[in-house]
Amino acid sequence: MSICLIAEEGADSGALSSLAERWGLVSDPNAVMALVLTTERLELRKQDEPKLGAIFVDFVAGPMAHRRRFGGGRGEAVAKAVGIKKDYLPDVVDATAGLGRDAFVLAALGCHVRMVERNPVVAALLDDGLKRGYQDAEIGPWLRERLTLLHASSMTALRDITPPPDVVYLDPMFPHKQKSALVKKEMRVFQSLVGADDDADALLEPARALAKKRVVVKRPDYAPPLAGVPAQSMLETKSHRFDFYLPV
């Protein structure tokens, strides 16, 4: 995959070269999307729209840390969706990990979560965030145990992953409504990189074959069900819904 690779002053340019080799990234100085290694972390930037800011994964500070400390805990919709109960913490495969937010919430609540991400740039961002999280004195010990990353296509992972999880969680990228100029800046950068998950419909069947208890599909409230298959039940929130499917 081609992307502009930049090491900022003071950052380790050798580490950037190693990172490019590991994730199969080819440097293109003219690319709109740039992967930038700073002295602190790895960032994704859209060079023609610098005001959109940088995307990075940070499990230690910022919004994710705030959500862990002050969010709804077990009352969060995603926790209810995967079926967390008093003594039940499901093993989860998040087959469309993205920036790892929902996976992190579930791990913070005690679930073991295997994140699957096929895009090498997004996987590199996740891996960078995990490395820093693993080294943190407060969250590192449980994060290392509960949250892991697999860089692979979801189709491959859903076919080959062992042992099978209790729950497969799918949150495929869905095109935003055209009128939605309020789409988060971050989402605009992210969608410029990965686009819509046009093959997401193909994930439902292997997900149902793999999961032991349920498949959970997160959808915008205006989106049709994945693969056109009506959900067997659902949980609705203000702007999203979680569609539930039984294993087959």
UniProtKB/Swiss-Prot annotation:
Its EC number is 2.1.1.242. It is found in: Cytoplasm. GO terms for cellular component: cytoplasm. Pfam families: SAM_MT. Disulfide bonds: none annotated. It comes from the Bacteria. GO terms for molecular function: rRNA (guanine-N2-)-methyltransferase activity. InterPro entries: 16SrRNA_methylTrfase_J, SAM-dependent_MTases_sf. CDD domains: AdoMet_MTases. S-adenosyl-L-methionine binds at residues 101-102, 117-118, 153-154, 171. Keywords: Cytoplasm, Methyltransferase, rRNA processing, S-adenosyl-L-methionine, Transferase. It catalyses: guanosine(1516) in 16S rRNA + S-adenosyl-L-methionine = N(2)-methylguanosine(1516) in 16S rRNA + S-adenosyl-L-homocysteine + H(+). Its main location: cytoplasm. Belongs to the methyltransferase superfamily. RsmJ family. Specifically methylates the guanosine in position 1516 of 16S rRNA. PANTHER family: RIBOSOMAL RNA SMALL SUBUNIT METHYLTRANSFERASE J. HAMAP family: 16SrRNA_methyltr_J (MF_01523). This is Ribosomal RNA small subunit methyltransferase J. The lineage of its organism: Bacteria, Pseudomonadati, Pseudomonadota, Gammaproteobacteria, Enterobacterales.
